[in-house]
Design a protein with these regions (language model features):
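Metal-ion/cofactor- or nucleotide/acyl-coenzyme-handling active-site neighborhoods
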Residues: 1-152
Length: 152
């Protein structure tokens, strides 16, 4: 079945997964993408509580999705597959991208900084964010197993 909600802002994914993305019930993306519910990009650093004003990229779709989930009213948010590390030659879930081979030194530190910022912003709100990725360099959110997450 098609996912209810999906977030994509990488232009390449609209070409690679065009048919699958078209089947998504609610696709959230940035302005100037071929289709989907577009949200104005406010910049890289910051945290948006109101998608009508816009969203911050945090340099990763995970940060985009975090803000969107908060805006939608979710009180428990679970990250799965957010490892922020390369697995051998693969740089992304869809394989290798030569343009991002150095992400661990260039982009990952910015992503980690912003995800930590998100954790700090949400610390006293009652919104709980969990990292269900068994192998992950991200320490901003408590790590729990997928089984424990499903039991919450």
């Amino acid at each position: 079945p098609a996912p209810y909600y999906q977030c994509v802002f990488d232009h390449r994914l609209f070409d690679l997964f065009h048919d699958a993305l078209k089947k998504t019930r609610q696709l959230f993306t940035l302005e100037d993408r071929p289709f989907g519910q577009s949200i104005k990009l406010l910049g890289g650093d910051g945290f948006s509580w109101d998608m009508e004003e816009g969203i911050y990229s945090g340099y990763t779709i995970s940060y985009f999705a975090l803000q969107l989930a908060v805006y939608m009213g979710f009180k428990k948010i679970f990250f799965l597959g957010l490892d922020l590390k390369h697995d051998g030659h693969n740089t992304h879930f869809f394989g290798q991208d030569p343009q991002t081979i150095n992400h661990e030194k260039t982009e990952f530190p910015r992503m980690i900084k912003m995800l930590q910022h998100g954790a700090n912003v949400l610390a006293d709100t009652g919104i709980k964010v969990y990292n269900c990725s068994p192998v992950s360099t991200l320490e901003a959110f408590p790590k729990i197993s997928f089984g424990d997450a499903a039991a919450l």
